Amino acid sequence: MHSSKLIGTVCLLALVLCCVDATLPTTTNPAVVEFGTADAALLQCFDKTIYEFNKSPSAVSFISPTNINYVKVETLKPGLNGGVTAEITSGAIKKPNIVITLTEPGRRSLFKSNIRVTMFCAK
């Protein structure tokens, strides 16, 4: 009798853990978003960190004397904190100006992780 209660308790605990795991939010947003093509000949011309708990969405803009050829947006704490949605809202790659809008996935109003935006320009 005692062992059947133990087995029942273990089965119930396993069922509860499976249900809890199924309710955790899944993130399909990547930890890194890239625009353009990385090249060793490019120079880093911009670096900015959007800190955790800042408002989402947030826009990052930059005007360079030379063309911006590659942009890397990365979540600094990926995993359960998820990724980030990034899109070019003004300007373009291989142009001297660009505006990138960053959004926390899941319609949250604050970023759950630090986000780093790095831009690389032509020499």
PLM regions with names:
Residues 3-22:
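Cleavable N-terminal signal peptides of Sec/SRP-targeted secreted and luminal proteins
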Residues 10, 24-29, 38, 67, ...:
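N-terminal compositionally biased, intrinsically disordered segments and leader/signal-like regions
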Residues 18, 90, 117-119:
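General N-terminal targeting signals
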Residues 21-55:
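Extracellular receptor-binding modules and their adjoining Ser/Thr/Gly/Asp/Asn-rich linkers
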Residues 54-107:
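Extracellular attachment/recognition segments
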Residues 112-123:
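Short, structured beta-strand segments at or near domain termini in extracellular proteins/domains
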